[in-house]
Every structure is written in C-alpha cells, then in structure tokens.
C-alpha cells in the first residue's frame, strides 16, 4: 500500500509541475470563439472574452496521445507535421528525440494519396499542430484512414480529428511546451526515461527562435571590419604609370597670357563677292558656289 501511495503522489507531483509549466507557457489561453465540441475542455471565460482551458484535461489528453504513439512499433511510421512557423522547430525536435518523421513547412498535396509522387508515404499515425492550418493533411489522412492527433484551440474544427488535445496552438512558447511534454511522456512510457527522473533536454530547445537572434553571432564570427576612415587613401599617381606622371607641370609649358588674339576675317562687301580674305590661323576660305548669284527672290 505504501508503494502504491508513493507512486501516486509522485505522479501527482509530476502532474502539478507539468500544469505549472503549461500555465507559464500560456497553454491555457484560448480564443474569443469556441467550437461546440471544445466546450467540454473549457474551464471559464474571462471578462475580455478569452476562453480558459482546463489544463488537467489537457494533461490527460497528452497521456492518451503518448499511449497511442507508444503502441506503434516502428516510430518511422509516425509523421509529425506543422505548417505554422512557430511549430516547425518543435516538430523537428520531437522527431529527433522520438524517432518519428517530421514535415516542417507547407504540405505538398497528394503526399498521402498520390502514389505517383516521390514524397508519397503511408503513415500509421499523423500528429498535427493546428487543424486549421494543416487542413490538407487532415483531408488526405481521412481518405487514407490514418489516425490523427492534433492540438486544438477553442475555435479549431474537430472534423476528422481522432484525438484532440485542448491547448493554445498559436503561441510559440505553448507549442514548444506541448511537444516537449509529449516527447517526454513517450520516452517515459518506452522506458528510456525513468518515471521519476528528470529529462536532461531543456524545454527551451523546442521554442521558436527569431531569425534576428543569429545575426550578431555571424557578425562576430566574421571578425571586426575596418572603418572607412581607417582605409589607406589610393595613390592616384600609380594608376597607369607608363602614361601618367606625378611631376608638376612647369609654368612655361602653359600658353602665355600675352598671346595675340585671333583676328576675325573681314566681312565681304556683298553676298556676291567671291574673293574673301582667308582667315588667320591656316583656315582656308570656302569655295564659292558654281552658279551665278540670284538677282532677287523669284
């Protein structure tokens, strides 16, 4: 009797710790709309209209989903998928620790129904992040009689979903916390982790990371860049050394200021005068026209 009591108390303490973690990750926050099939999992409604989940029922549904996952002999027959960006990292981490296959990103239509595709697969279980964003794999899984486990919010459609886990499936912390708890429960049921032993993997590894967080690290690895003012000035005299020179041009090489200006050619007496004085500077006068000048306008 004492052994059973200690085991139940340890399980209760673990459940309390998991509920506190889910509460810190805002798993209990729903939306302002509630589907009639999700009303049984709602604890209350706040004054601002947000529905609050009963995290005790969420923990029980996680246990049920973990039992279904463990019942499948080959983990490669399980596909965990997320089209939502906040769940893609959590999906990859869950597949890494449980041995399942992960599809992070957009679902290619026909993956579960079209045998002509190279990416065709027939999984025995499908785990999804959001039934609304992952509606295409739900439809294909229903056509192929594939059991579906999904994290469902208060406004999520429950059609073709076999096991709906009531939780917040829109927050980056809540999605990571849910997949971390599900992965730990699966490993505990498989015997990889002892029942009372703490899992070494931190829940932070399942959280979504912003792309800007890795940018300063790349800059530090590249090394400090030289400032613009610290760069050496280019030596213009070295460009084209065969043709250019840096020596100063003497003043004698420039034309003098006292040089006589070029005089203009004298104007002809009339338009008919063909013999005009040549212009100075070697310019020759233009040849006169061959025909006789016209006397007037005709």
From Swiss-Prot:
The modification N-acetylalanine is found at residue 2. It is found in: Cytoplasm. PROSITE patterns: RIBOSOMAL_S2_1, RIBOSOMAL_S2_2. The lineage of its organism: Eukaryota, Viridiplantae, Streptophyta, Embryophyta, Tracheophyta. One of its GO terms (biological process) is translation. It comes from the Eukaryota. The gene is RPSaA. Belongs to the universal ribosomal protein uS2 family. Keywords: Acetylation, Cytoplasm, Ribonucleoprotein, Ribosomal protein. Residues 263-298 have a biased composition (Low complexity). Gene3D superfamilies: Glucose-6-phosphate isomerase like protein, domain 1. This is Small ribosomal subunit protein uS2z. The keyword Zinc does not apply. Required for the assembly and/or stability of the 40S ribosomal subunit. Required for the processing of the 20S rRNA-precursor to mature 18S rRNA in a late step of the maturation of 40S ribosomal subunits.
């Amino acid at each position: 009797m004492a052994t059973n009591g200690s085991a139940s108390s340890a399980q209760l303490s673990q459940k309390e710790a998991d509920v506190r973690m889910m509460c810190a990750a805002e798993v209990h926050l729903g939306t302002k709309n509630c589907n009639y099939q999700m009303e049984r999992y709602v604890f209350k409604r706040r004054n601002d209209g947000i529905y609050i989940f009963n995290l005790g029922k969420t923990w029980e549904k996680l246990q049920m989903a973990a039992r279904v996952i463990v019942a499948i002999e080959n983990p490669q027959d399980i596909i965990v998928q997320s089209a939502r960006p906040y769940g893609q990292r959590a999906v990859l981490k869950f597949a890494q620790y449980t041995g399942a296959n992960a599809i992070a990103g957009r679902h290619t239509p026909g993956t579960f129904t079209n045998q002509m595709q190279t990416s065709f697969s027939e999984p025995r279980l499908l785990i999804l992040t959001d039934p609304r964003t992952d509606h295409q794999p739900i439809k294909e899984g229903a056509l192929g009689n594939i059991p579906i486990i999904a994290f469902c919010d208060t406004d999520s459609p429950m059609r073709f979903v076999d096991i709906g886990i009531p939780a917040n499936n829109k927050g980056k912390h809540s999605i990571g916390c849910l997949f971390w708890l599900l992965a730990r429960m699966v490993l505990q049921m498989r015997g990889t982790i002892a029942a009372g032993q703490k899992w070494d993997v931190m829940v932070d590894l399942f959280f979504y990371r912003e792309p800007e967080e890795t940018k300063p690290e790349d800059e530090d690895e590249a090394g400090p860049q030289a400032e613009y003012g610290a760069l050496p000035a280019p030596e213009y005299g070295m460009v084209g050394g065969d043709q250019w020179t840096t020596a100063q041009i003497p003043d004698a090489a420039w034309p003098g200021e006292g040089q006589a200006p070029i005089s203009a050619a004298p104007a002809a007496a009339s338009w008919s005068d063909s013999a005009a004085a040549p212009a100075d500077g070697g310019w020759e006068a233009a040849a006169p026209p061959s025909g006789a000048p016209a006397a007037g306008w005709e």
